[in-house]
Design a protein with these regions (language model features):
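Short, structured helix-loop boundary elements
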Residues: 19-22, 76, 80, 93, ...
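Amphipathic alpha-helical effector-binding/dimerization core
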Residues: 74-173
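Short amphipathic alpha-helical signal-transduction/dimerization elements
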Residues: 33, 155, 159, 163, ...
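N-terminal helix-turn-helix
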Residues: 1-93, 254-259
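Intrinsically disordered, low-complexity polar/acidic regions
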Residues: 179-180, 211
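Amphipathic alpha-helical regulatory segments at dimerization interfaces
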Residues: 31, 47, 99-110, 116, ...
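Extended hydrophobic
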Residues: 186-255
């Protein structure tokens, strides 16, 4: 049996206003990924409880733009290969080289845990790349997933790279809430942890965001970016290894930066 630890908390949108039409478009694309077959307007409308006219308008627009077609007349709609072309172009122009993914693969192999690359996005961090552990009991993260910047190890490894004034401005915008009993509830508490952890060079999350999940992260200032490389896994396996794994991540990242700058 495989047991997977997943960050399931959903970030509140705060001041961000979702554009419904765009959100619906992405929902539809993800539906095609799950269905793996042509879908009719009726099936799409029923899946999302959309008015038939709304589903028709979205589908018609995507057909007109060349993103959907009918493999068989009146047999439903399916994405065209234009999506693949776009994805390939984006991948080819990715600002991070393949060697960064290789570093995650190496560290996942050496530690036996899930490794991920995180980048700042306002008061959140977003996962850019993930290499999942092969262990039966493991932490799983999804590319594009967002987490609070102040309570996660990756987030604090990123905050540590900010100038004091910029960091203070970010911490001031955070809506502090108690995820777990040891969650940082003030900007001062976050700042104290950052100063305490700076001397060792890595940042830890002993279950302060999600129960049973521990994290370790180090800053990854690669080519002017302010990212973090982080490890996630079950508390029972990771907590006792905070120091050894933190030092391993720090050494590996320092070596990578020297070889690739």
């Amino acid at each position: 049996m495989v047991i997977i630890f997943v960050y399931q908390r959903i970030l509140k949108p705060g001041r961000t206003m979702l554009v419904r039409q765009i959100s619906n478009l992405f929902d539809l694309v993800e539906l095609f990924v799950r269905a793996r077959k042509p879908l009719s307007v009726r099936e799409i409308a029923e899946e999302f409880s959309w008015p038939r006219s709304s589903a028709f308008n979205i589908v018609s627009t995507m057909v007109e733009r060349g993103y959907l077609y009918q493999p068989v007349p009146r047999g439903g709609y399916y994405p065209t290969s234009r999506w693949m072309d776009l994805a390939r172009e984006l991948a080819d122009s990715q600002p991070l080289p393949e060697s960064v993914h290789g570093l995650l693969v190496e560290l996942a192999s050496r530690t036996g845990e899930t490794l991920f690359l995180a980048a700042p996005e306002g008061t959140s961090v977003v996962f850019l790349d993930v290499v999942e552990s092969s262990a039966d009991i493991r932490f799983i993260a999804n590319i594009g997933q967002r987490l609070p910047i102040h309570v996660t190890a990756a987030g604090r490894a990123i905050l540590a790279q900010y100038a004091p004034a910029e960091r203070a401005a970010v911490l001031k915008r955070i809506r502090y809430q108690a995820y777990e009993k040891d969650t940082f509830m003030t900007a001062d508490a976050v700042e104290e942890d950052l100063q305490r952890s700076a001397t060792q060079g890595w940042y830890v999350n002993p279950g302060v965001y999600a129960p049973g999940v521990a994290g370790i992260a180090v800053p990854f200032p690669f080519r002017g970016r302010r990212d973090a490389i982080a490890l996630g896994g079950p508390m029972s396996r990771v907590e006792a290894r905070f120091e050894s794994v933190g030092a391993l991540l720090r050494e590996a990242v320092d070596r990578f930066l020297k070889e690739n700058e």
